UniProtKB/Swiss-Prot annotation:
Catalytic reaction equation(s): a fatty acyl-[ACP] + phosphate = an acyl phosphate + holo-[ACP]
Record's protein name: Phosphate acyltransferase
Name of the gene: plsX
Organism listed in the record: Moritella marina (Vibrio marinus)
GO cellular component, one term: cytoplasm
Family assignment from sequence similarity: Belongs to the PlsX family.
């Protein structure tokens, strides 16, 4: 297995190096051929590596940074200022060819703007898209994009999203002929706005896509489609709503045992089974959204990700680099006029 190097924005997210460093240590134990750049506050990073074995430490390279981009900072300000931020410096390592991927739990808008500014975009790509895996009723996950970085876009952009998402599902998700659908308010051809109707025409004519038509919100997790395409506003609302529903169900199941003696007894029997099933819906194991359309791998972790969730994000970067995803996406886009 060839050596692989990833750059981590060690300071990003709600918990910064207290999550990113332990996660990175565990990942190095699992992937013996992996090396990691840790970009951030050198003193903080070193303090968290004190009890790490020499063999693991030798595969870390610390790159000191001077700034951290606040989570609520406007993307334009992140671009103009914060030249020595951990996020920007981690992305620069990818641009310079020193790392094959960057992983950050920092400000999503800043990551998008800086990635596009520093790395540019692939030929035939107008704008990168944010894609993530979601659980389904089958054994296969669902890939959904865009999830928020393109709140408005045209039909040509949705075609690009579809091609990139299909390449991801095929080469990283190991789905031979991914089924691609457009998220809409109905399945009939007459349903939807002009955007999705025009996009449907483009997707149906593209020979690189296995386009199956429209899909409704209630079927996102059904497994009927492998790749679901929409604008970023729609995708983000759908994603956050589904996460909220999972939290609500788990909260209700946790509190139901306090009602009376019957529900207490029933919960002792049933709740462990239900909670076990619901664990596969928790976002931790699906952490790690990808910015597709760049000449390098950039992974966005949830800002509130804990250690295990951040490990999933790093693993997603490893899988995408190993699959040669960037080249596969470039090949899939070559057919666009």
């Amino acid at each position: 297995m060839p050596n692989l190097t990833i750059a981590l924005d060690a300071m990003g997210g709600d918990f910064g190096p207290h999550v990113t460093i332990p996660a990175a240590i565990n990942i190095l134990k699992k992937y013996k051929y992996l090396s990691i750049y840790l970009v951030g506050n050198e003193a903080e990073i070193n303090s968290l590596l004190q009890n790490t074995s020499t063999s693991i430490k030798s595969r870390f390279t610390i790159i000191p940074s001077l700034d951290d981009i606040p989570m609520d900072l406007a993307p334009a300000l992140a671009l103009r200022n914060f030249k020595q931020s951990s996020m920007r410096m981690a992305l620069n390592l990818v641009r310079e060819g020193k790392a094959q991927a960057c992983v950050s739990a920092g400000n999503t808008g800043a990551l998008m703007v800086l990635s596009r500014h520093l790395l540019k975009v692939l030929p035939f790509v107008d704008r990168p898209a944010l894609v993530s895996t979601l659980p389904s009723m089958t054994t296969q996950p669902v890939y959904m994009l865009d999830l928020g970085v393109n709140v408005s876009c045209d039909a040509d952009a949705l075609l690009q999203f579809a091609l990139m998402g299909s390449a991801l599902a095929e080469h990283v998700g190991n789905i031979p002929i991914p089924r691609v659908a457009l998220l809409n308010v109905g399945q009939e051809d007459i349903k939807g706005n002009d955007l999705v109707k025009h996009a449907a025409q483009l997707l149906s004519k593209n020979p690189n896509l296995n386009y199956i038509g429209f899909i409704e919100g209630n079927d996102i997790f059904s497994g009927k489609a492998d790749v679901i395409v929409c604008d970023g506003f729609t995708g983000n609302v759908a994603l956050k709503t589904s996460e909220g529903v999972v939290d609500l169900v788990i909260s209700q199941l946790t509190s139901v045992s306090n009602n009376n003696i019957f529900t207490k007894l029933l919960s002792l029997l049933v709740k462990p089974l239900i909670m076990s099933s619901l664990k596969r819906l928790k976002p931790d194991q699906y952490n790690g959204a990808t910015l597709l359309g760049l000449p390098g791998i950039v992974i966005k972790s949830h800002g509130n990700a804990k250690q295990v969730a951040f490990e999933f994000a790093i693993e997603q970067a490893v899988k995408e680099v190993e699959s040669g995803l960037v080249n596969k996406i470039s090949a899939s886009l070559d057919i666009i006029d």
